[in-house]
């Protein structure tokens, strides 16, 4: 006879793969009611809380706003942006990167035409972006960021909005790699008990993650969130004290102290580079992607840094330091 406090747990978990991005996950048996309890929780996490990558900003040569059209390109800018939102990406080494797309027509432009390095993978390279009908060269700069769930462009307002150049188009970001998820609860039976549940989760992803792994991550998130209820009297663990950081004082000085030309200084501030420590972590390639910053300005920056024993491409641990508060950055921006 089963004790009152003994709950059945699933004896089998079956993953029925329909294809690489679509699968049905079956859990049984569950106590009556637990099918809907777990199904609802997992479905909400899969839809709203899964991390992933998305294109969040687009800059097209010759285009100032999304209501434009491009001569020699079949699609208007709005349709191009919608197609770019459908590009499925994986990014391993960083939280943010910038990619470029350069294509000369006539011909079809696909996700495979996006130039990328080893840290970025496009899992749907045949995805259509646009069609060039004339002898036009399309040049596009794409910002890719990691995030979670769905984030509207308006909610990503930041301090650099006032300095953002015309033509940098913001996209609503759907970071979640889960495209569709649904569940049903069916009847299950164990020996003489016929009042049990069987949970069937129907899951489809964009290809950047396998359905089985998506379920596993969602279950891990759920487990971490409810673990605190196991022992409500448990004291919160004190946060470890951070050791005092040893940082060269010159890195904490604003870039204005480098006495660069007005053009170079403004270009750096437009990219949220307010301190010398921010600057030395950038590479030459990254700086050359900065609007209005050319090779002459880059040479000037390198020479000034070299005179102080610094260089571009340096790696700084624990930057920015705790002592560099947000209000300090705001003050630097207002200088």
UniProtKB/Swiss-Prot annotation:
- Region (Alpha N-terminal domain (alpha-NTD)): which ranges? 1-233
UniProtKB keywords: DNA-directed RNA polymerase, Nucleotidyltransferase, Transcription, Transferase
Q: Which reaction does it catalyse?
A: RNA(n) + a ribonucleoside 5'-triphosphate = RNA(n+1) + diphosphate
Mind listing the GO biological process terms from this record? DNA-templated transcription
Annotated region (Alpha C-terminal domain (alpha-CTD)), positions in chain: 247-335
- EC number(s): the record gives 2.7.7.6
User: Which InterPro entries does the entry link to?
Assistant: DNA-dir_RNA_pol_insert (IPR011262), DNA-dir_RNA_pol_RpoA/D/Rpb3 (IPR011263), DNA-dir_RpoA (IPR011773), RBP11-like (IPR036603), RNAP_asu_C (IPR011260), RNApol_insert_sf (IPR036643)
GO CC annotations, alphabetized: cytoplasm; DNA-directed RNA polymerase complex
Q: List the disulfide bonds.
A: none
Supply one GO molecular-function term. Answer: protein dimerization activity
Q: Does the keyword Cell inner membrane apply?
A: no
Coiled-coil zones:
none
> What's the superkingdom here?
Bacteria
Q: Name one Pfam family in it.
A: RNA_pol_A_CTD
Report whether Methyltransferase shows up as a keyword of the record. Answer: no
Instruction: Write out the similarity annotation.
Output: Belongs to the RNA polymerase alpha chain family.
Q: How does it assemble?
A: Homodimer. The RNAP catalytic core consists of 2 alpha, 1 beta, 1 beta' and 1 omega subunit. When a sigma factor is associated with the core the holoenzyme is formed, which can initiate transcription.
Q: Domain note for this entry?
A: The N-terminal domain is essential for RNAP assembly and basal transcription, whereas the C-terminal domain is involved in interaction with transcriptional regulators and with upstream promoter elements.
Record's function text: DNA-dependent RNA polymerase catalyzes the transcription of DNA into RNA using the four ribonucleoside triphosphates as substrates.
**What protein name applies here?**
DNA-directed RNA polymerase subunit alpha
Biological source species: Alcanivorax borkumensis (strain ATCC 700651 / DSM 11573 / NCIMB 13689 / SK2)
The gene is rpoA
């Amino acid at each position: 006879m089963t004790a009152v406090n003994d709950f059945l747990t699933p004896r089998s978990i079956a993953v029925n793969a329909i294809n690489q991005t679509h699968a049905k996950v079956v859990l049984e048996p569950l106590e009556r009611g637990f099918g809907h309890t777990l199904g609802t929780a997992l479905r909400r996490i899969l839809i709203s809380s899964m991390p992933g990558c998305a294109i969040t900003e687009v800059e097209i040569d010759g285009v100032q706003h999304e209501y434009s059209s491009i001569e020699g390109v079949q699609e208007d800018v709005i349709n191009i942006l919608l197609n770019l939102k459908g590009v499925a990406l994986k990014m391993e080494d960083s939280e943010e990167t910038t990619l470029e797309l350069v294509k000369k027509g006539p011909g079809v432009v696909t996700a495979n035409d996006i130039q990328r390095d080893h840290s970025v993978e496009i899992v749907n390279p045949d995805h259509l972006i646009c069609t060039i009908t004339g002898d036009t060269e399309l040049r596009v700069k794409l910002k890719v960021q990691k995030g979670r769930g769905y984030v509207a462009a308006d909610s990503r307002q930041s301090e650099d909005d006032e300095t953002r150049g015309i033509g940098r188009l913001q996209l609503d970001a759907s970071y979640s790699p889960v495209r569709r998820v649904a569940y049903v609860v069916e009847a299950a039976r164990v020996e003489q008990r016929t009042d049990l549940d069987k949970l069937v989760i129907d899951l489809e992803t964009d290809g950047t993650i396998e359905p089985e792994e998506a379920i596993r991550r969602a279950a891990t998130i759920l487990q971490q969130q409810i673990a605190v209820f196991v022992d409500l009297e448990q004291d919160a663990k004190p946060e470890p004290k951070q050791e005092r950081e040893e940082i060269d004082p010159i890195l904490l000085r604003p870039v204005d102290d480098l006495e660069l030309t007005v053009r170079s200084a403004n270009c750096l501030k437009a990219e949220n580079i307010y301190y010398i420590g921010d600057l030395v972590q950038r590479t030459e390639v990254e700086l050359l992607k900065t609007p209005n910053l050319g090779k002459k300005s880059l040479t000037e920056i390198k020479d000034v840094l070299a005179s102080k024993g610094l260089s571009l491409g340096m790696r700084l641990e624990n930057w920015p330091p705790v002592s560099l508060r947000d209000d300090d950055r705001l003050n630097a921006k207002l200088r």
